[in-house]
Swiss-Prot record:
Residues 106-163 are annotated as: Disordered. Residues 18-96 form the S1-like domain. Gene3D superfamilies: Nucleic acid-binding proteins (2.40.50.140). One of its GO terms (cellular component) is nucleus. This is Probable RNA-binding protein EIF1AD. It comes from the Eukaryota. Belongs to the EIF1AD family. Residues 126-136, 146-163 have a biased composition (Acidic residues). Pfam families: eIF-1a. The lineage of its organism: Eukaryota, Metazoa, Ecdysozoa, Arthropoda, Hexapoda. One of its GO terms (molecular function) is translation initiation factor activity.
Amino acid sequence: MHRSHPSTTRRKHLIKEMMEDDYELPTEQQQIVRVVRSCGNNLHEVETATPESENFLVSMPNKYRKNMWVKRGDFLLVEPIEEGDKVKAEISKILTNDHVKEYTKAGIWPERFAKNPPQEAKAQNDDEDSDFEDDLTPNTNRPVQESDEEDEDTDTESSDEED
């Protein structure tokens, strides 16, 4: 009988845990933060919802390491730790868009983060800049493919001019 690799099983359970999350509201000790940058060694610099507070480091717990990833702009639920001087909290939950929606409905989502969540801002930019693809530089590693649509457009224009 073939047994799956322990890390694969662990990853499956973590993903299942995140998908079946009941969107439990944060406790009084926990706070919502946004990732500013990744510092390596499972440490991430985060900013809080209060603008006057300084950025600080949070650590990724062992259960998430090598299984879950966070990037700049992601939201986290962190819990403070006592023993750290520079590292002041540990990640307790990686927040998804569904968490953001639920927390906003509950009225606990911070105002500072409500203005432009990265995913919604990106969706708005896609709606506003429909010609975004025109700004891209062409890929010189592939042969240029001429589309038939352009030929049809020029054919219809020339036939309109003839009438």
